[in-house]
Amino acid sequence: MALKMRFLYYSKKAKMKDLAEAIKKEFDLAQNYNAIDVIPPAYSCENERLVILALSGNDLDDMVRRFCRELDKKKAQNVALLIDGNDKVAQTALDVLKETGTNVIENVKMVKFGGLPFIGGKLSDDEKKDLLDWAHSVVDSIK
């Protein structure tokens, strides 16, 4: 049985959408039509085994902060962070998520996608491999 998992992102960068699609394909999430979505998602999380939050920016947006505050154990048992930004965003998101009582994966992935929103092309093969390896390590850590 496949892992009940979602990849939610807050970014306008093309590489983030590309990564979302790669995760969906790698973990065979096609049966779940809302497995990848933007924050806030069209359908709320419910009893997810893992939610990967991918955030871009140098500050945690208030809408994202509110969304994170709602991710309790009933909505997401485990949450992992992928940050395209600075340590401040990562630490703020970690602090907010830990307050909810959900298990926050300590292995936060920091990336620098760079480029302008909607421009920046696709993930390189090396970037894709690195990010998928990280995602597998997160999934393995909760099995």
PLM ranges: what are they?
Residues 3-6, 26-34, 46-143:
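FMN-binding flavodoxin-like domain, especially the glycine-rich phosphate-binding loop
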Residues 2-26:
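N-terminal beta1-alpha1 ligand-phosphate binding loop
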Residues 38-43:
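Short acidic active-site motifs
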